[in-house]
UniProtKB/Swiss-Prot annotation:
Primary enzyme class: hydrolase
Enzyme Commission code(s) on record: 3.4.19.12
The encoding gene: USP17L1
Catalytic residues of the enzyme: C89 (nucleophile), H334 (proton acceptor)
UniProt entry tagged with the keyword Electron transport: no
Protein name, UniProt field: Ubiquitin carboxyl-terminal hydrolase 17-like protein 1
GO molecular function, one term: cysteine-type deubiquitinase activity
Function comment: Deubiquitinating enzyme that removes conjugated ubiquitin from specific proteins to regulate different cellular processes that may include cell proliferation, progression through the cell cycle, apoptosis, cell migration, and the cellular response to viral infection.
Basic and acidic residues compositional bias, start-end: 382-392, 398-411
Species: Homo sapiens (Human)
Length: 530
């Protein structure tokens, strides 16, 4: 992750405003000059409602508002962990947060896009649909993200998680557009991605000489917050919308009185997104040094104080995902995330490891990126989770997975996900997997005779080694990026030390080998049964 980011973005470009910097979705912006005085300001409650409609005329509406589909097939349990392919923790952490973004996930599970996609090559929406579908329907497994997700971005080294996140969001937004290159910027603001993540800023400049008002509107997909002097997200938001005085060298050149006069500039949210991506600016632009300080962020956030219209009720958002960076520089360290996969349950997603955690642990992190969703949207999309079918248990039949894979292939040629199915591996050390093995053992009254090879001296005398580890006790510790969990990944490379039993474990063996068939370079798991 360096200064040579591949994300084609830049700073928000307000005519007379430099306080806000963020990833900009496109170069389009609109400016509206007003000639009225404050007591006759055209920005009344009636006029404000229509301003964004003026910015996005009905020439072509790609995703009608309030028409996002609610999938009835979303499982209620947490999905799969993601295998670290070498310095890809930033990718895994971002994908997990997007996977548990309810409006996006429900749209992907509905397969509405793939059924109508006309792109000859794979698009990001089709690729994300395949990934989200497999991740949510593979609880207890570890899957390998498709290389197409980071194509053109990953260069074999650590990258910035925010840059990759916006790279992915922008690629999905472009996939929503028609195939031809010339697309009106108003049309871009009606895409599915903009309907989920997009909003509109209003920068209002008031000339203190003639009292004229100039309004500039600009779309956004994320919000960058300066935390240098802020102890909380609320303080950072208050600083962001605090009026700025323009005088002296920064005096405003008024287009109404045609004079260079002092003015005040106020930034507010004209429309707020369904899903807010708040980026805490922890890294310096030049050296990449990290600002390691605790910044408080709430579980519920009221965005009404930062809106242009103040005469409405609370606009409550709820936290559902957090991206965290562990380290001292943007050039190294480790990324992981926290997600709320159910209405109240939080999980820590650290590459292949998926663990239950509490909200106290979530709110005590040095967060880098925060994901909030409007409470009404969360409740609306959560209803589809309760109506969805129950997730399959650990070790469910492979035929069901293959049937789903074939179903995806028939929908669109981009949804080719054999590598995901081939790389679904069992997390052998999980308690539920061990219980499943014991259940298989109890189905047969006759216990097989096990031919057990040499057992490590540190194991109990009655221990049974199902998979002999090829790593010795004296092995060196790995860098956090290199140990995505030795016990979570499996391999088919057979060693001279391996000794497998026969009999009632034959079916379990066969299924394990099929699931691990092409994972040639991963580590062998060790399962000890008392």
């Amino acid at each position: 992750m360096g200064d040579d980011s591949l994300y084609l973005g830049g700073e928000w470009q307000f005519n007379h405003f430099s306080k806000l910097t963020s990833s900009r979705p496109d170069a389009a912006f609109a400016e509206i000059q007003r000639t009225s005085l404050p007591e006759k300001s055209p920005l009344s409650s009636e006029t404000r409602v229509d301003l964004c409609d003026d910015l996005a005329p009905v020439a072509r509406q790609l995703a009608p508002r309030e028409k996002l589909p609610l999938s009835s097939r979303r499982p209620a349990a947490v999905g799969a962990g993601l295998q670290n392919m070498g310095n890809t923790c930033y990718e895994n952490a971002s994908l997990q947060c997007l996977t548990y973004t309810l409006p996006l996930a429900n749209y992907m599970l509905s397969r509405e896009h793939s059924q109508t996609c006309q792109r000859p090559k794979c698009c990001m929406l089709c690729t994300m649909q395949a990934h989200i579908t497999w991740a949510l329907h593979s609880p207890g497994h570890v899957i390998q993200p498709s290389q197409a997700l980071a194509a053109g971005f990953h260069r074999g080294k650590q990258e910035d998680v925010h840059e990759f996140l916006m790279f992915t969001v922008d690629a999905m937004k472009k996939a929503c557009l028609p195939g031809h290159k010339q697309v009106d910027h108003h049309c871009k603001d009606t895409t599915l991605i903009h309907q989920i993540f997009g909003g509109c800023w209003r920068s209002q400049i008031k000339c203190l000489h003639c009292h004229g008002i100039s309004d500039t509107f600009d779309p956004y997909l994320d919000i960058a917050l300066d935390i240098q002097a802020a102890q909380s997200v609320k303080q950072a938001l208050e600083q962001l919308v605090k009026p700025e005085e323009l005088n002296g060298e920064n005096a405003y050149h008024c287009g109404l009185c045609l004079q260079r006069a002092p003015a005040s500039n106020t930034l507010t949210l004209h429309t707020s997104a369904k899903v807010l991506i708040l980026v805490l600016k922890r890294f310096s632009d030049v050296a990449g040094n990290k600002l390691a300080k605790n910044v408080q962020y709430p579980e519920c956030l009221d965005m009404q104080p930062y809106m242009s219209q103040q005469n409405t009720g609370p606009l409550v958002y709820v936290l559902y995902a957090v991206l965290v960076h562990a380290g001292w520089s943007c050039h190294d360290g480790h990324y992981f995330s926290y997600v709320k996969a159910q209405e109240v349950q939080w999980y820590k997603m650290d590459d292949a490891e998926v663990t239950v955690c509490s909200i106290i642990s979530v709110l005590s992190q040095q967060a880098y990126v925060l994901f909030y969703i409007q409470k009404s949207e969360w409740e609306r999309h959560s209803e589809s989770v309760s109506r969805g079918r129950e997730p399959r248990a650990l070790g469910a039949e492979d035929t069901d997975r293959r049937a789903k894979q074939g179903e995806l292939k028939r929908d669109h040629p981009c949804l080719q996900a054999p590598e995901l199915d081939e790389h679904l591996v069992e997390r052998a050390t999980q308690e539920s997997t061990l219980d499943h093995w014991k259940f298989l053992q109890e189905q047969n009254k006759t216990k097989p005779e096990f031919n057990v090879g040499k057992v490590e001296g540190t194991l109990p005398p009655n221990a049974l080694v199902i998979h002999q580890s090829k790593y010795k006790c004296g092995m060196k510790n790995h860098h956090p990026e290199q140990q995505s969990s030795l016990l979570n990944l499996s391999s088919t490379t057979r060693t001279d030390q391996e000794s497998m039993n026969t009999g009632t474990l034959a079916s379990l063996q066969g299924r394990t080998r099929r699931a691990k068939g092409k994972n040639k370079h991963s580590k062998r798991a060790l399962l000890v049964c008392q």
